[in-house]
Amino acid sequence: MRWLLAYVMLLGAAHAQQPQNPSPMVEHTRAHPRLKEETPPGRRENLDLGTLFLPAHSRAIFFFFHGGTWLPEVAASRNKVAVVSVQAGAGSATYARLFDDPRRFLRLLAEAEAKAGVKFDRVMLGGWSAGCGAVRQILKTPESYARVDAALLIDGMHTDYVDGKPGPLESEIDPGNLAIWLQLARDAIAGRKRLIVTHSEIFPGTYASTTETADYLVAQLGLRRRAVLKWGPMGTQQLSEARAGKFRLLGYAGNSAPDHVDQLHALLVLLKWLR
């Protein structure tokens, strides 16, 4: 019996000393379909930050970060909303710095409304991957938070590890960067806002994964994930879901770069759900 106990302890120690490897860049099981690049009809205006696209009869506006230009325009055109597309480089900190001036977002919205010649009746924010850093920074300003009706976080809700690295079992993550998402989720559950969060199974290794942050959010909200197994938009495979009120969290299979990009190309459908 003693040798068995010693073996189990040794096995546990060995596993604790082996960090999980970062996620791969390739995946060959799923099809990973992609939207075809196109230029939908509509008016385009350069703004102080980003490009405004105005399809006909658009009364809602969507600010989207880190998705290029044509893809958000295609999604906006199909959903009949205006979109401001912003591409600013790599890393969530790069996008957060765009809104270090807490008044910048409302100025940008006012500029978009002036060029559109309309006061938008619905304001939505969205980001993919690093772009979620801009959304977080915007919402930290109470005046901007009050003006925003809905937000979409596509596989980009990250934070740091408390000790700077993942734990051997369940990691301890820094809740600081997640506080605004928790506030927004509670408002969505109460019906005051709408929030959609998606995540993959990607493990960055140097900061908390979107799976870990999603687990934290669900736990803090007192919700339970429901295990599902079904096809999602653009060939994604949905594994889990949690929802309450106007809050919705969806977990998708995949821990590779193509799986990450799949969710960006699902923007057309995700924006429809956000409306």
Report residues per predicted region.
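Catalytic active-site module of serine/aspartate enzymes centered on a nucleophile-bearing elbow/loop
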Residues: 253, 260-275
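Glycine-rich nucleophile elbow surrounding the catalytic serine of serine-hydrolase chemistry
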Residues: 127-137
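Active-site machinery of serine-nucleophile hydrolases
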Residues: 56-116, 235-239, 247
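Alpha/beta-hydrolase fold nucleophile elbow
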Residues: 117-129
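Sec-dependent signal peptide recognition
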Residues: 1-7
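A domain-start/cap signature at the N-terminus of enzymes
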Residues: 16-61, 235-237, 245, 275
